[in-house]
Amino acid sequence: MLSKIRPKVKQPLERIGKTLASLGITPNQLTIIGFLITLLASYEFYLQNQILAGIILAVGAFLDALDGALARATGKVSKFGGFLDSTIDRLSDASILFGIALGGLVRWDVTFLTLIGSYMVSYSRCRAELAGSGTLAIGIAERGERIIIIFIASLFNAVKIGVYLVAILSWITFIQRVYEAKKRLEMG
């Protein structure tokens, strides 16, 4: 769903990307910095500091949104950069949920189902696109939406509700993608 507003925020993000480029920061460095900040958010979730964790998570997610803009601003768009960003996103998702579970904020089984659902959203898109479906950026809970849900829930010390919501929406999104991929791939 957030992918629909991406064109509206592209230009402001690219202006910030140009500023970061003038500081000598590379897109891959920004990806790693964002991940390290996300690890700090995970640690704060472990300590049950939900509000602080949510704020730190938002900073890490914002930097994650900037790495692509920085790559475009510097002409450093690369296949490896896309691979690194996507891979680090999966590690970030796991670390956040791990911190939440380790802190006792959500049961492990719910955390596991949430993580698998989140991974299946990403994996189903990747596999469908490799099979020739075209871009499959559909569904009610892509990664951006999932991060926003956890962020907002954290601000209200309600991360448990946020994780349950992410779990449900991730599985719905996965099913939406399977259905859409089937439709597209059987047509082509």
Swiss-Prot record:
Transmembrane segments: 20-40, 51-71, 96-116, 147-167
Substrates-to-products reaction catalysed: CDP-2,3-bis-O-(phytanyl)-sn-glycerol + 1D-myo-inositol 3-phosphate = saturated 1-archaetidyl-1D-myo-inositol 3-phosphate + CMP + H(+)
Keyword Transmembrane helix set for record: yes
Chief location of this protein within or outside the cell: membrane
Taxonomy, superkingdom: Archaea
Biological process per Gene Ontology, one example term: phospholipid biosynthetic process
Binding site for Mg(2+) 2: D64, D85, D89
Names of required cofactors: Mn(2+); Mg(2+)
Cofactor note: Binds 2 Mg(2+) or Mn(2+) ions per subunit.
Residues bound to Mg(2+) 1: D64, D67, D85
EC number(s) stated in the UniProt entry for this protein: 2.7.8.39
Pathway(s) annotated for this protein in UniProt: Lipid metabolism; phospholipid metabolism
GO MF annotation list: magnesium ion binding; phosphotransferase activity, for other substituted phosphate groups
GO annotations of cellular component type: plasma membrane
Active-site residue numbers: D89
Places the protein is found: Cell membrane
Membrane protein topology class: Multi-pass membrane protein
Keyword GTP-binding attributed: no
UniProtKB keywords: Cell membrane, Lipid biosynthesis, Lipid metabolism, Magnesium, Manganese, Membrane, Metal-binding, Phospholipid metabolism, Transferase, Transmembrane, Transmembrane helix
Family: Belongs to the CDP-alcohol phosphatidyltransferase class-I family.
Function noted in UniProt: Catalyzes the formation of archaetidylinositol phosphate (AIP) from CDP-archaeol (CDP-ArOH or CDP-2,3-bis-(O-phytanyl)-sn-glycerol) and 1L-myo-inositol 1-phosphate (IP or 1D-myo-inositol 3-phosphate). AIP is a precursor of archaetidyl-myo-inositol (AI), an ether-type inositol phospholipid ubiquitously distributed in archaea membranes and essential for glycolipid biosynthesis in archaea.
Protein name: Archaetidylinositol phosphate synthase
